[in-house]
């Protein structure tokens, strides 16, 4: 089940990146404490480390990761921001995930 492992790793990576970007947003836009920058930096460090765990060429990982990031950002919109995604948000996420699957799981000769 390497596909499930890859997708799970992408989802965890996206969550770390989103949290690492959301916390400074809270400080800058919502007037929250500057101390949020500490966990934000740690989250972005974890994000970077997680990217190194993907078992394929970095360019392919970055390209495919973008599809999962889009999906996770739409989930964040729904769960954290409390905004229900539109049909177009869901279709766009599905297309992005399809692109990720093609990039990551298509047969290749090495």
Swiss-Prot record:
The primary location reported for this protein is membrane
What keywords sit in the KW lines?
Cell inner membrane, Cell membrane, Membrane, Transmembrane, Transmembrane helix
Q: Which InterPro entries would you find in this protein's record?
A: UPF0060
Indicate the transmembrane segments per the record: 7-27, 33-53, 63-83, 87-107
GO cellular-component term (any):
plasma membrane
User: Which spans of this chain does the record mark as coiled coil?
Assistant: none
Give the bilayer topology: Multi-pass membrane protein
Q: Name the domain of life.
A: Bacteria
Compartments reported by the entry: Cell inner membrane
Similarity comment: family membership: Belongs to the UPF0060 family.
NCBIfam families referenced in this protein's UniProt entry, alphabetically: PRK02237.1
Recorded protein name is UPF0060 membrane protein Mmwyl1_1139
